[in-house]
């Protein structure tokens, strides 16, 4: 792993400009409102989380998979490759990169089938339609898009250091850690360095736990305006999440989501590959 975030591909290539991100997203916002797009982000992050938990992966592996997923759709429309295929592909790749060990083909397909059937049947009434050849092809497109820049830095390590420095590990760490997990349901991992996200999550945890840490934050040599920007995104997430009924809303949102054509079928593999290739070639 690159030892210095500031010299890493994560910082040099994958901290994106917000306006560029929104510009790329306009193709999808012809079909979805901004709020519906947010809800899709929350939903597919939940799918990746459920897949990772089913496979008993560490949280860092799940977080890396989520970042890969977001990186792909930061550059390409949802219709380029079906997110239902991209989600397990990201889990498959992240498990290798994070040295968790390769998830076997059988386990991966079994997990995706089981999770969609038991946890998300309200959104996906049909069986998981993909097989390992689709996952491997999708992985190729994902690797090409990311230019093989696979090392991802996360807020977990800096968060642990900050909480220890503050001397409030037992009081603040569990809540701040959960808030970090929740930030992966937003664009924050594409827009800000992980240490800033860690500080913002710690700030929110301090407010919730009524811990006065103003002096500690005042002594940091960090742009507090950016920390406040991140906090606003976190608060917006919780506000939207509170009013989001996945079971009632997702089937309708997914029906509006732009999709690759034609969908895969038992003898239409060429069509699937063609749709992914043509979608991938759009810039």
Swiss-Prot record:
<feature type="region of interest" description="Disordered">
    <location>
        <begin position="252"/>
        <end position="283"/>
    </location>
</feature>
<keyword id="KW-0805">Transcription regulation</keyword>
<dbReference type="GO" id="GO:0005634">
    <property type="term" value="C:nucleus"/>
</dbReference>
<dbReference type="InterPro" id="IPR031658">
    <property type="entry name" value="Cyclin_C_2"/>
</dbReference>
<feature type="domain" description="Cyclin N-terminal">
    <location>
        <begin position="46"/>
        <end position="144"/>
    </location>
</feature>
<dbReference type="InterPro" id="IPR006671">
    <property type="entry name" value="Cyclin_N"/>
</dbReference>
<keyword id="KW-0678">Repressor</keyword>
<feature type="compositionally biased region" description="Polar residues">
    <location>
        <begin position="267"/>
        <end position="283"/>
    </location>
</feature>
<keyword id="KW-0539">Nucleus</keyword>
<keyword id="KW-0010">Activator</keyword>
<keyword id="KW-0804">Transcription</keyword>
<dbReference type="GO" id="GO:0045944">
    <property type="term" value="P:positive regulation of transcription by RNA polymerase II"/>
</dbReference>
<dbReference type="Pfam" id="PF16899">
    <property type="entry name" value="Cyclin_C_2"/>
</dbReference>
<dbReference type="GO" id="GO:0016592">
    <property type="term" value="C:mediator complex"/>
</dbReference>
<dbReference type="InterPro" id="IPR036915">
    <property type="entry name" value="Cyclin-like_sf"/>
</dbReference>
<keyword id="KW-0195">Cyclin</keyword>
<dbReference type="InterPro" id="IPR043198">
    <property type="entry name" value="Cyclin/Ssn8"/>
</dbReference>
<comment type="function">
    <text>Component of the Mediator complex, a coactivator involved in regulated gene transcription of nearly all RNA polymerase II-dependent genes. Mediator functions as a bridge to convey information from gene-specific regulatory proteins to the basal RNA polymerase II transcription machinery. Mediator is recruited to promoters by direct interactions with regulatory proteins and serves as a scaffold for the assembly of a functional preinitiation complex with RNA polymerase II and the general transcription factors.</text>
</comment>
<dbReference type="InterPro" id="IPR013763">
    <property type="entry name" value="Cyclin-like_dom"/>
</dbReference>
<comment type="similarity">
    <text>Belongs to the cyclin family. Cyclin C subfamily.</text>
</comment>
<protein>
    <recommendedName>
        <fullName>Cyclin-C</fullName>
    </recommendedName>
</protein>
<comment type="subunit">
    <text>Component of the Mediator complex. The cylin/CDK pair formed by ccnc/cdk8 also associates with the large subunit of RNA polymerase II.</text>
</comment>
<dbReference type="GO" id="GO:0016538">
    <property type="term" value="F:cyclin-dependent protein serine/threonine kinase regulator activity"/>
</dbReference>
<dbReference type="Pfam" id="PF00134">
    <property type="entry name" value="Cyclin_N"/>
</dbReference>
